[in-house]
From Swiss-Prot:
The gene is uvrB. A motif (Beta-hairpin) lies at residues 91-114. Forms a heterotetramer with UvrA during the search for lesions. Interacts with UvrC in an incision complex. The keyword Hydrolase applies. It comes from Synechococcus sp. (strain JA-2-3B'a(2-13)). This is UvrABC system protein B. Residues 652-687 form the UVR domain.
Length: 695
């Protein structure tokens, strides 16, 4: 029986029961790849949640960016409140990789800032994978980067049990060996302190305190303590403390690694000198000798990850261990969300990393073994995957091929193209929306007078908004300049309009989308920012300017994704402005019409009247400062209430800002406000972890 407990007031409807049954059947039959081809707004996440619940295996859900990963994690935590739904993304707030530009002889040192909260979540994810089966890890593509060997990580963990006899000095030495730091004054994550017979540890994977009480050398009690109030939260009979860092190197392995690094250094120096590269040889020797001295003395050096091949005992070219290796062999499931974007990302990670590091090696900044500190190659990643579900409204041909779909070839515009044959292979379609809302009508109109025609459509929706539910408009252009010019033109005619393009920061982007949903303006103009993951049920019109300009932004998949932005509204409509009908346009329109006819027929058969989507507005402002500015109210309580709904990916940033405010308040002797902020930081950390964890 599955350990996953799905909690929802809703039952699967429309195509969902058929899709769930199809996916579960395909997986239970042992098929490696299957695809959920689900139209926008059909509840693909709900279908995947039911599939996970019925399959009952630990699951990795991959998304193509951290914002989408946070959205998925929030949704899955609501559906699985009693299970471990973890969040695993890159822990860098800022990252400037090491690089060298030969043309200008410019060396750029690595510069980074690690987010402590996200690091805690990463440790929480790996701990859950060791200790339970009912685990869903939602991750970005960065999870294919090296993470340290799971065997060494588990082997280095320290078990504690009530009644166990253990020398206190040995415990302190063991904690130090797995990167915990002793500090008897300030107890924070990754530190421990000993006072008399009481040892207190804050593990790497959460902020609760583990208190171990000794009677002589015998463990008398193990308790979980609230770090703020000191309240006893739980008493345990046993627990295991995992290392403070994922990269764990035993002392014997470190000594072997140092010898291997020295040997590689001598070989590379001989090669450089033979080729007359004396500057490169001098540079490499100086840098590497310093690193070796640091490794001997303190077991660590800056850029230690560049020696990871030696430290983990891998051979040249062997893939590094990553998050996938923390899952148990073949007993797990992979779900790739928005696979048409995520799969190419997996494919491209290795090449970009390799090109940068090769320059460093060629010019004596790094040993050749640094090339093995890398993300997995695509083929290495897929070799580790036992069973997988691709999820997309527009899956790529590669995903469809892996799902054994059939294709037909046609010549269009002088090119031979492959097209998926509907209903073939292990491709499960999900077309019917639970709300009964059908795909929008698509109209093609000439480009002559397109702006005036668009203006008329906008005015029509503004008039309807006065009498009924609010309607919004999305307009997509081909260039940033066009977006800005169109925005200015519409503003001059009294339209409340904003634009989005690549130069707008992620925080500003979410603020603009939030204002759009709340009705602060009615028209949003953008370039390539209005496709996957933009969930706005208020949008009743999507206008696509220059739809006949073939290219990535007007390819079939891009057009279907843009059409999908109007597919959540009962009055959804799409207008493509074009003078010719391109093959991409024709295919996108034909697919939309095919889905629309299926949906209309289903509604007629089941006497369903489409209902507008009522969606909780959860994309709140991303930072405390933005919340305060938006409310125009210094009242901390109101600002914090607004902060309760922020996306999961932004909580670490908010915690950092609240901590700065807390320290500033304490410095100004405003202890009451500092205490309020401390309590709120604690609540946000609890939300970040997502569920009360037993250790």
């Amino acid at each position: 029986m599955s350990e996953f407990q799905l909690v929802s007031p809703y039952q699967p409807t429309g195509d969902q029961p058929k899709a769930i049954a199809g996916l579960v059947k395909s997986i239970s039959e042992g098929h490696r790849f299957q695809t959920l081809l689900g139209a926008t707004g059909t509840g693909k996440t709900f279908t995947i949640a039911h599939t996970i619940q019925q399959v009952g295996r630990p699951t990795l859900v991959m998304a193509h960016n951290k914002t989408l990963a946070a959205q998925l994690c929030n949704e899955l935590r609501e559906l699985f409140p009693h299970n471990a739904v973890e969040y695993f993304i890159s822990y860098y707030d800022y990252y400037q990789p090491e690089a060298y530009v030969p043309s200008t002889d410019t060396y750029i040192a690595k510069s980074s800032s690690i987010n402590d909260e996200i690091d805690m979540l990463r440790h929480s994810a790996t701990r859950s994978l060791f200790e339970r089966r009912d685990v869903i890890v939602v991750a970005s593509v960065s999870c294919i980067y090296g993470l340290g060997m799971p065997e060494e990580y588990l082997k280095a963990s320290i078990p504690f049990k009530v009644g166990q006899e253990i020398n206190q000095r040995d415990v302190l030495r063991d904690l130090a060996s797995i990167q915990y730091e002793r500090n008897d004054l300030e107890l924070v994550r990754g530190r421990f302190r000993l006072k008399g017979d009481v040892l207190e540890i804050v593990p790497a994977y959460e902020d609760r305190v583990i208190r171990i009480e000794f009677f002589g050398d015998e463990i008398e009690a193990i308790r979980l303590i609230d770090p703020v109030t000191g309240e006893i939260l739980n008493s345990l009979s046993a627990l295991r403390v995992y290392p403070a860092r994922h990269f764990v190197t035993p002392e014997a392995q470190l000594e072997r690694a140092i010898l291997n690094i020295e040997q590689e250094l001598e070989e590379q120096l001989a090669l450089f000198r033979k080729e007359g590269k004396l500057l490169e040889a001098q540079r490499l020797e100086q840098r590497t000798r310093y690193d070796l001295e640091m490794l001997r003395e303190v077991g660590y050096c800056n850029g230690i990850e560049n020696y990871s091949r030696h430290l983990t005992g891998r051979k040249a070219g062997e893939p590094p261990a990553c998050l996938v290796d923390y899952f148990k062999a073949d007993d797990w499931l992979l779900v790739v969300d928005e696979s048409h974007v995520t799969v190419p990302q997996i494919r491209g990670m290795y090449n970009g990393d390799r090109a940068r590091k090769q320059v460093l090696v060629d010019h004596g900044f790094r040993l050749p073994s640094a090339l093995d500190n890398r993300p997995l190659k695509a083929e290495e990643f897929w070799a580790k995957v036992h069973q997988c579900i691709f999820v997309s409204a527009t899956p790529g041909n590669w995903e469809l091929e892996q799902s054994e779909a059939q294709f037909e070839t046609r010549v269009e515009d002088g090119k031979t193209l492959k097209f998926y044959v509907q209903g073939s292979g292990r491709v499960i379609e999900q077309v019917i929306r639970p709300t009964g809302v059908v795909d929008p009508e698509v109209h093609v109109r000439p480009t002559a007078g397109q702006v005036d025609d668009l203006l008329g459509e906008i005015y029509l929706r503004l008039e309807r908004s006065q009498l009924g539910p609010a309607e919004r408009v999305i307009v997509t252009t081909l260039t940033k300049r066009m977006a800005e010019d169109l925005t200015e033109y519409l503003q001059e005619r009294g339209i409340r309009v904003r634009y989005l393009h690549s130069e707008i920061t992620s925080i500003e982007r979410i603020e603009i989308l939030q204002d759009f949903r709340e009705g602060a303006f009615d028209v949003l103009v953008g370039v390539n920012l209005l496709r996957e993951g933009l969930d706005l049920p208020e949008v009743s019109l999507v206008a696509i300017l220059d739809a006949d300009k073939e290219g990535f932004l007007r390819a079939e998949r891009s057009l279907i994704q843009m059409i999908g932005r109007a597919a959540r509204n009962v009055r959804g409509m799409v207008v493509m402005y074009a003078d010719t009908m391109t093959s991409s346009m024709a295919r996108a329109i034909a697919e939309t019409q095919r889905r629309r006819e299926i949906q209309l027929q289903y509604n007629r058969q089941h006497n369903i009247t489409p209902k507008p989507i009522v969606k909780k507005n959860s994309n709140a402002i991303l930072s405390f400062l933005a919340i305060s500015r938006k409310l125009n109210d210094p009242d901390l309580e109101k600002a914090f209430q607004a902060a309760q709904e922020i996306p999961l990916s932004e909580i670490p940033e908010l915690i950092g800002q609240l901590e700065l405010k807390m320290k500033e308040a304490a410095k100004n002797l405003e202890f009451e406000e500092a205490a309020q902020l401390r309590d709120r930081i604690k609540k946000l950390r609890q939300r970040l972890l997502g569920h009360p964890q037993g250790i």
